[in-house]
Swiss-Prot record:
Keywords: Aminoacyl-tRNA synthetase, ATP-binding, Cytoplasm, Ligase, Metal-binding, Nucleotide-binding, Protein biosynthesis, Zinc. The gene is cysS. It catalyses: tRNA(Cys) + L-cysteine + ATP = L-cysteinyl-tRNA(Cys) + AMP + diphosphate. Its cofactor is Zn(2+). Monomer. This is Cysteine--tRNA ligase.
Length: 465
């Protein structure tokens, strides 16, 4: 069965044809480890995990590389401001190396909780400084670089199709239109390959180079490491849509300038998680971590399930009520799995084919979930066949259906039905009915709390009754 994926580079859905079948080289942009990953970041890693699982499901042998940015990512993506890790080190009064190590391990723990398969190769930027220097030297020899007072820059005007990934027009980008204006730059889109350490500041992370003491630019890191481990071109490069206009655009420019061949054949990007009216992000000051969800009683796999309810190329709005619904759905799935006998059985071919078609249509996980529930509700299928088929699906879903965690449903289903009924009344501005339902919920021993992200429900205590 053919697999089709949406390629950001060509702006269309394409049949997936790897360069060297059955092998697939896949590079994903990892975290900048100066803080905990928020659940918006984690949505992207869940999408990439689904992509990897779908590739494996289709019989491909995947070599997956993910970087860890532990130096060089400044507070502005456009080479301005302070290094995020150095800034956090000052704030927490620890070394930059300690900060990077601490948040790297925290990130890996989050991936494990979400059932995200580890990459075959983790590559830390600080372990590859010479690789970055070597790539910059190639670009320098080919005439793509120039020097300013603060670093070595890439001249984007020498790349005729610069901006092709994002569909940007170089000539129409006025100075300062997208990035902070730097009068020493030849073009507003030019970016740093190597930044010099400020003369009056002693950085914790800095290295000697042919151009002077400093540190690598953010974009050069992914170009050098992806080429080192996957060659060029490789099959798939992915990340979040925020990477398209600057980071991935600059990766393509420098990689293709250096090696005179395409960087990657397919480019895939996951959409934002929305909270309120904005995308979730540390810069927006509106982010939630996986630990925050756990503290509120949500299983990490409930968040994974929640992410599967929307297509990876569609924005997903986060509300507590939507997460509650996802957790209840997942827990019902677990309860069903526990009822099915653990007998040897073959999966149902009709359902498997429908599921396979859905995931091969650009990772259509909402449809795949709908097929999953059709299967659960199908009274004609033997329970052991249902179990075998769900386990087959779980190779992609990654919800631990073979070993469901012990769960305790604290809020009964009938209470949630009342909550949903009240939400509908509020939407229709039937305030009298909404108040009546609130009282009924209270009489049954639960308190409802309205928040900007949706209703929160909890068991009443003697103090809250």
């Amino acid at each position: 069965m053919d697999l089709y994926l949406y390629n950001t580079l060509t702006k269309r859905k394409e049949k997936f044809e790897p360069l060297n079948p059955p092998y697939v080289g896949m590079y994903t942009c990892g975290p900048t480890v100066y803080n905990y990953a928020h659940i918006g970041n984690l949505r992207t890693y869940i999408f990439e995990d689904i992509l990897k699982r779908v590739l494996i499901y289709n019989g491909y042998i995947v070599k997956h590389v993910m970087n860890i940015t532990d130096v060089g990512h400044l507070t502005s993506d456009a080479d301005e401001g302070e290094d995020k890790i150095e800034r956090e080190a000052k704030k927490e009064r620890r070394s930059a190396w300690e900060i990077a190590e601490f948040y790297t391990e925290a990130f890996k723990r989050d991936l494990k909780k979400l059932n995200i398969l580890e990459p075959d190769i983790w590559c830390k930027a600080t372990d590859h400084i010479q690789d970055f220097i070597d790539l910059i030297l190639i670009l320098e020899r080919k005439g793509y670089t120039y020097r300013t007072s603060d670093g070595i820059y890439f001249d984007t005007s020498k790349v005729p199709d610069y901006g092709k990934l994002a569909g940007q027009d170089l000539e129409n980008l006025l100075p300062g239109a997208r990035v902070e204006y730097n009068p020493e730059k030849k073009n507003p889109t030019d970016f740093a390959l190597w930044k010099f350490s400020p003369k009056d500041v002693k950085r914790q992370m800095e290295w000697d180079s042919p151009w002077g003491v400093g540190f690598p630019g953010w974009h050069i890191e992914c170009s050098a490491m992806s080429t080192k481990y996957l060659g060029q071109p490789f099959d798939i490069h992915c990340g979040g849509i925020d990477h398209i206009p600057i980071h991935h655009t600059n990766e393509i420019a420098q990689s293709e300038a250096a090696y005179d061949k395409p960087m990657a054949k397919y480019w895939l990007h996951g959409e934002f998680l929305i909270m309120g009216e904005k995308r979730m992000g540390k810069s927006e000051g509106n982010f939630i971590t996986l630990s925050d969800l756990e503290e509120k009683g949500y299983h990490p796999l409930s968040y994974r399930y929640f992410c599967l309810t929307a297509h990876y190329r569609s924005p997903l709005k986060f509300t507590w009520s939507a997460l509650e619904a996802a957790q209840r759905a997942l827990f019902r799935l677990y309860e069903n799995m526990k009822k099915y006998p653990k007998e040897e059985a073959k999966y149902d071919e009709k359902y498997e084919e429908e599921f396979h078609k859905a995931i091969n249509d650009d990772l259509d996980m909402p449809k795949a979930l709908a097929i999953t529930w059709e299967l659960v509700k199908d009274d004609k299928l033997a329970p052991e066949v249902k179990r075998a088929t769900l386990l087959q699906f779980d190779k992609v879903l990654g919800l631990s259906l073979d070993n469901p965690p012990e769960i305790k449903i604290e809020i009964p289903e009938e209470i949630w039905k009342l909550v949903e009924e009240r939400e509908l009344a509020r939407k229709n501005k039937d305030w009298e009915k909404a108040d009546r339902i609130r009282e009924e919920i209270k009489n049954r021993g639960y308190i409802i709390e309205d928040t900007p992200q949706g209703p929160r429900i909890k068991k009443a205590t003697p103090l809250t009754k």
